[in-house]
Amino acid sequence: MPKLTQLSLVTLALTAGSTLVSQTASAHGYVVSPESRSYACKTGSNVNCGAVQWEPQSVEGASGFPESGPADGKIASAANGAFSPLDEQSPSRWSKRDIKSGWNDFSWQFTANHVTRNWRYYLTRQGWDQNQPLSRASFDLAPFCVIDGGMVQPPKLVTHNCYVPEDRSGYQVILAVWEVGDTTNSFYNAIDVNFSSGAVVPGEWTDIGDINPSLDLKAGDKVMTRVFDANGEQSAKQTQITIADATQGAKQNWPFLLASAINAQQPQLKAGQKNAAGVISPVYGKNEIFAAPKSGLERVEVSFDIAPAPGNQLNVTSLADDYTIVDGAAQVSFDVSTNADMQVSAYLFSHDGTAAGYVTQAVNNTSASLVLDVVAPKAGHYHLQVKAEPKQGEVIQQNFDLFLKDQATAPDADFIFPEGIKSYVAGTKVLQPKTGKVYQCKPWPYNGYCVQWSPTATGFEPGIGNSWTMAWTEL
C-alpha cells in the first residue's frame, strides 16, 4: 500500500477583500462524485432513505473519528437519528459506483463552505461484514488520503485527487470526513463503491440504470423496463413481468424476478449486483442494470402498470326464505362478508313499507352474523335491504324478500329426522321430533354438514347438536 498521501487543496484561494463566514454559520456539504450514500438518496439512485433525501448536506456529527465521533453502527448517519436509514447495511441495500484502484477524484459540493480543518478518507477492510452496520471494525482506521484545509474557507466545489489502495476488490465503502475548523463537528459521507478485479479496463459492462425496491406490488400488477439509446426508446429491448401474488409483489422480491427476466431475455443487458470477480447476478432488493460494451444503450428506466384494485364486495348468506313467529316474537338472522372495512346495515320493511327492524355492524374484510329483531311481527311478506358503506367507494345495496309465518303455519317438512339423511341437500326441510320444530339445510358450503350424523356423532343434529347452527336454519 502506498504511503499516506498529503495533498494540497486544489484551487483553494480566497479572493481579495472576501470575508470569512460567521462563526455561527451552518456548514453543510456532501460528496457528489462518486455519489455518496446520502447524495444518491437525493438523486433517486437510493430509495427508502427517509429525511436525508431532502438534506444530504446535513449528515453532521461530533468530530474525532475514529478515536471518538459517531458510535459504531451509527457512522453512516453521523449518529443523527433523523438520518438513521443511512445505517442500514446489506450487500444489496445501496447503489454502488464502479471505482478503480490508484488515483481517483473525490468532489465535494458545499451549500455553506465553512472554514475547514481537514478532509479524511477511510476505506473498509477486505472481507468486512457487509451485513452489519458500519463500525470501526469495518474500516482500516488509517486514512488513505488526508487533505489539509488550512483553516480557511474552501470554494463551493472542491475536488481531491487521492490514491486508492490496490488491495481491495468487490463491494467496499469509503468514509469521507469533512472536519470543519470553527465548530466541534464533522460531516460524514459513506460512499458505496465496487472494485473490479484489477484496474477498470475499457470494454466493461456499464451501469445505466437501477431496479429500486421502491414499493410493494399486488397480483396483476406489471413492472417493466424502458431502454433508451441515443435515438430514443428501444421498445424491442423491453422486459416485463406480471406479479402473480403478494409474495412475488413484496418490494424485496420483485426486483430479483425482474433482474432474472432481463438476464434471460436481453443479451445486451445484465441486471444484478457485481461481485468481487465482476460477475453480475440478481439479488433480492436493489439491482443495477448494466449495458454490454459497444451496445449503444444509454439508459434504462423501470415503470409500473398498476392493476385496478378489486371493487368493494358484499356477500349475504344463510338467509332463509321464511322465519317463524314464536310467542309473538321473530328474528331474521343471516351472515355477511366484505372484502374491505365497511359498516353493514340491514333494514326490514313490511309489505306496505313500514319499518320493521334494523341492525348494523362494522365488518372489516371478514364475515359476521347479524340478527335482526322484528318489530311487531305479523305473518306475511317482508322486504330486507342490506347496505354496506365502505370508507372509500360507493355504497353497496342488496335486496331480499322473505316471509314470516306463524308457528301453526310453519312449513311442511320433507323428512322426519333422521329419515332419508343421505338425500339431504341445501334447502331440505326436516321435522325434529325432539323439539317439534322444522329446520332447513343451509346452502353451500354448509350443506355438507347436514348429512354428517350417526347415533354416536350428533354434533350437527338439527336443534340438538353442539354445532347444529353450522348446518341448519330453524324455520
From Swiss-Prot:
Localization terms from the record: Secreted
Leader sequence segment: 1-27
All copies of domain Chitin-binding type-4, residue ranges: 28-195
A Pfam family recorded for this sequence: LPMO_10
Annotated coiled-coil segments of the chain: none
Source organism superkingdom: Bacteria
Keyword annotations: Chitin-binding, Secreted, Signal
Predominant place of localization: secreted
GO cellular component, one term: extracellular region
Domain Chitin-binding type-3, first and last residues per copy: 426-468
Signal is among the record's keywords: yes
GO molecular function: chitin binding
Family: Belongs to the GbpA family.
NCBIfam families in alphabetical order: PRK13211.1
Record's function text: Probably interacts with GlcNAc residues. May promote attachment to both epithelial cell surfaces and chitin.
Name of the featured protein: GlcNAc-binding protein A
Organism: Shewanella oneidensis (strain ATCC 700550 / JCM 31522 / CIP 106686 / LMG 19005 / NCIMB 14063 / MR-1)
Gene name linked to the record: gbpA
